[in-house]
Structure formats: C-alpha cells, structure tokens
Regions:
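Conserved N-terminal glycine-rich FAD pyrophosphate-binding loop of Rossmann-like flavoproteins
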Residues: 54-72
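Conserved N-terminal helical subregion
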Residues: 22, 37-39, 66-178
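Glycine-rich FAD pyrophosphate-binding loop
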Residues: 39-59
C-alpha cells in the first residue's frame, strides 16, 4: 500500500504541473458559458471572479438568442432547459418609433432547425442555468485592480486585497469593462 500511495502522490505532483490554471474575469453569460465548456476538460483548473457581490437580476429582463447561440448552448445541454421558461417566436414585427405603424416583419422560424430555434427567455433564467454546477467556483466581490504578467504566469490583484495566479486569463466582464 505504501508503494501505491507514493506512486499516487508522484502522479498528483506531475498532474498538478501539467494542469493549467485559468482565471475567468466576469460571471455573466459569456464567462459562465466558457466555464461550462471547461467543465468538460479535465486538464484545467479554473475560477470565476465576479465584481458584483451577488447575482440578483430583475425577473423581467428578457433576452433573445439566435439559432447560432442556441447551437453553442446545446453543447452544454441547453436543450434540456425547461420548455416553460423559454419561448420560440415565429416572426419579429418592426414598427416605426414615431408613428407605431408596422414597417415589416421577419419570419425568423425560417432559420430554425429541429434542435436549434430562435429563443427568448429571462436573462436571470439563463444565468441560473449556466451557473447551476459552478457555484463553488464563483468568487463574488472580486473587482480586479491589477494584472501582472511575469515568467509565463499571470498575477491578479483585486480591490479586496486578494491575489490569484493563473496560466491563462479570460476577460469576459461585459460592457462595463475597464
């Protein structure tokens, strides 16, 4: 048994050297999507650093997802998402902002496939779907203040005085990026 424990310890040391550390800055849709993709990879260790201190989203904030985005989301089992929380419209109507008259419509169902359909849903429902298996990897209240790159390592410093080191950095902090 001692031999196997030493062998296992050596294996873990080698594996740890080979395992790449990834820091994902931003716990929104793109950061969470990327983290879900990494969940299927065994040679990456990662954490998600979100500057907000919580995930409180307004329930009524809706988003639209194109067929192409649904194709990507289906890679992380979005096709198993609750049907009663999403809607697949057939067309979009365009109206004049001045007169409210209809200008035209677009039959978006023409772009649908059997597995990928134009979809609308609440942003909060999509975020909850994306973060459901990642809760322990999300660090909230981590606003980045400095990025330093030395000796093929990236050192992150946060406003809360915490530090993190990684091999790769994914910055997906949205439209309010610094």
């Amino acid at each position: 048994i001692g031999f196997y424990l030493r062998l296992q310890r050596k294996y873990l040391i080698v594996l740890n050297k080979l395992m790449k550390k990834i820091a994902i800055i931003g716990g929104g849709i793109s950061g969470l999507y990327f983290a879900n993709i990494l969940n299927h990879q065994k040679n990456f260790e990662y954490k998600i650093f979100e500057k907000k201190d919580n995930y409180n989203f307004l329930e009524g904030y809706g988003i639209q997802l194109s067929v192409n985005s649904i194709k990507l989301l289906n890679q992380i089992e979005f096709n198993k998402f609750q049907n009663d929380k999403k809607f697949n419209p057939d067309k979009i109507n365009f109206h004049s902002i001045k007169s409210s008259e209809k200008i035209c419509d677009l039959n978006i169902s023409d772009f649908n496939t059997k597995d990928c359909k134009y979809t609308t849903l609440k942003r909060s429902d999509l975020v909850n779907f994306l973060k459901k298996d990642l809760e322990s990897l999300i660090k909230t209240n981590y606003n980045i203040s400095n990025i330093d790159h030395k000796n093929q390592k990236i050192k992150l410093t946060f406003e809360n005085k915490e530090n993190a080191e990684c091999d790769h950095l994914i910055i997906s902090d949205g439209i309010f990026s610094k």
